[in-house]
Each structure stands twice: as C-alpha cells, then as structure tokens.
Curated annotation (Swiss-Prot):
Catalytic activity: Endonucleolytic cleavage of RNA, removing extra 3' nucleotides from tRNA precursor, generating 3' termini of tRNAs. A 3'-hydroxy group is left at the tRNA terminus and a 5'-phosphoryl group is left at the trailer molecule
EC number: 3.1.26.11
Names of required cofactors: Zn(2+)
Disulfide bond is among the record's keywords: no
Record organism: Chlamydia trachomatis serovar D (strain ATCC VR-885 / DSM 19411 / UW-3/Cx)
InterPro entries in the record: Metallo-B-lactamas (IPR001279), RibonucZ/Hydroxyglut_hydro (IPR036866), RNase_Z/BN (IPR013471)
One MF annotation (Gene Ontology) recorded for this entry: 3'-tRNA processing endoribonuclease activity
Gene assigned in the entry: rnz
Active site: 67 (proton acceptor)
Residue ranges of the TM segments: none
Name of the protein: Ribonuclease Z
Keyword annotations: Endonuclease, Hydrolase, Metal-binding, Nuclease, tRNA processing, Zinc
Complexes and interactors: Homodimer.
Length: 304
C-alpha cells in the first residue's frame, strides 16, 4: 500500500522565523504528491524533510500573496533540473494567471517538463479522475483565494461469508461488479446483497480566510482539515482586519464541519510557540494539532 500522509514543510504566515519557514504542505496519497502553497524556501525544506522533490505531481496555489506562492518558481525549476517524466499539474485562481506566469518564468532555465495549468474560475468539482476528486471553494480573504478538498473514490468491499453463501466465485464476480447483479442457480444476487461501500477519505485545505460557510461545506466530514489560524483570540481584531482566523475560529469551523482531525497552521511571526493555539482550539475541538515543520500526519486506510 502506498504511503498516505501529510508532511508539513513550513507553517509560518507572512514572515518566516528562525523556527518556522513560509508555509508549504505535501500530501502523499495514492501514489501522487500534492504540494499546497509552496512559500519561499520550499525547495530547501524538501532536503531537510529527506523527501525527493520529484514526488510532486500536482501543485495547488490558494492565492498569490507571496507566502503562499514564492516557492513555485524554484520548485518548477528543480523539477526541470531533475527531468521528471510525469506531468506537473498546477491549480490556481484564474484571476492570478499573470502572477503564475511571472513566477514560472521569473528566471532563465531550460524547460524539460510538461506543466499542465488549471486556472480555476468556478467553484465545485475541478477534476474527477481515478485517484481523486478535486473540489474548490472561494474563501473570504482580501484577494481571490481558493480552498481545496481532495477525495478518494469510494470502494466496494465484499463480505466473504455472503459471497460464499451465494455461491459466487471466479469470472462471475467481475460480472457482478460490472452489472450490479448476476443470476446464480436461478437466484438473482445483487451487489448490495454481498458487499458494502467504504467511503473514500477526504482532506480539506483552507488557507487565508475569515470564518465562512464555504469552509464548513468544503471540510464536511473530512478525515483531516488543515486550516489557517494566524492569531490567538486575544488578537482577534487583527484577524478580522487582515481577513484571517484565530485558533478558536478554526476550531469552530472544524466542529461545524464534523471533521475527524484539525491541524492548525499559518502562524503569525509574533508567536514564538504554538502551545496556546492547541489549548485555545482544544476547548472547542479536542482532536487538534499545531503544525510542526517536518512532522508527518499519517492516515492509514481504514480496513473496514
């Protein structure tokens, strides 16, 4: 089974600190590497994390404030240098096309890879293919900003005792999957009679935003919500004026969305530690963590 985990490559907001780099988040899942909001220095963070940049297959830019995209150009250059053979899909708000181009072509280099751009100008399903369904929602920030939801397909799980009792085996099993029913010894057996559906996991990624219904809709029942929490509640006036959230507000969104796990990130440089973020959010949503650089949050597939 391929690795399933979210690795924090950076978790600072506008300014990096001695202990926190600009934000960047790598989701390795179903044989792909999804990189979210690569800030300045992301390429170097891969080295410290002991992860090859070549695992990246898709890059998501929530918006074009520098701390969410300054690492895009250097990451694309690195992937060119490594001559990756797979295409690199890039998703970003369509209104930021000129900034994407500026970052991509900001220096002279030899382009060897195939970059497939997905400028997003609508909410809803962006792509739906074998490994994932990608959805976007418009968040409430100062500029066009997208939140993301990545969902794997549902899978059909057979119940061995019922398969045996129905006398199913061999090629007829594939027929049952394809047609939804088969005839065995003059009896019609439906797929639902001998199986159940395991819902695919979802992960929601919410960058800069005020609290809004879009976050709740995006994160509904997600396995993990990675959510900005730039400030503590004592600085809620700053959160409001800069269109960000506090740890408490992020926890409220997670509770409303009924997610399984909340990971806070995008911390203001004014805070030296993140313990208070966990304490503040934990009063509302207990299963909460503060992102730490190079920490990985694994989510193995539920066998049931």
């Amino acid at each position: 089974m391929s690795y399933r985990g979210l690795t924090i490559l950076g978790c600072s907001s506008q300014q990096p600190t001695r202990h926190r780099n600009h934000g960047a988040y790598l989701l390795r899942w179903n044989g792909e590497g999804l990189l979210f909001d690569p800030g300045e220095g992301t390429q170097r963070q891969f080295i410290y994390a002991n992860i090859a940049p070549t695992v990246v297959s898709r890059i998501f830019i929530s918006h074009f404030h520098g701390d969410h995209c300054l690492g895009l150009g250097s990451m694309l250059m690195r992937l060119n240098l490594d001559r990756v053979l797979h295409p690199i899909h890039c998703y970003y708000p369509a209104s930021g096309k000129k900034y994407f181009d500026r970052l991509r072509y900001s220096t002279i280099y030899h382009e060897t890879i195939k970059v497939i751009e997905h400028p997003i100008d609508r909410e809803g399903i962006v792509e739906d293919f074998g490994n994932f369904r990608i959805e976007s929602r418009q968040l409430d920030h100062l500029v066009d900003t997208l939140g993301w939801r990545i969902t794997e397909p549902d899978t059909t799980k057979f119940i061995p005792e019922k398969i045996k009792a129905a006398g199913l085996k061999g090629p007829i099993m594939q027929e049952l999957i394809n047609k939804g029913q088969v005839k065995v010894n003059d009896t019609i057996v439906h797929l639902d009679d001998v199986s159940y559906t395991r819902k695919g996991d979802s992960i929601a990624v919410v960058a800069d935003s005020l609290p809004c219904q879009a976050i709740v809709d995006l994160a509904r029942n997600a396995r993990i919500l990675l959510c900005e929490s730039t400030y503590l509640e004592e600085h809620s006036h700053l959160a409001k004026s800069h269109y960000h959230m506090t740890a408490k507000q992020a926890a409220e969104q997670a509770k409303r969305a009924e997610v399984q796990q909340l990971i806070l990130t995008h911390f203001s440089a004014r805070y030296n530690t993140t313990e208070e973020f966990v304490q503040e959010a934990g009063e509302i949503f207990p299963n909460v963590f503060a992102a730490e650089e190079f920490c990985s949050y694994e989510f193995p597939k539920n066998p049931s």
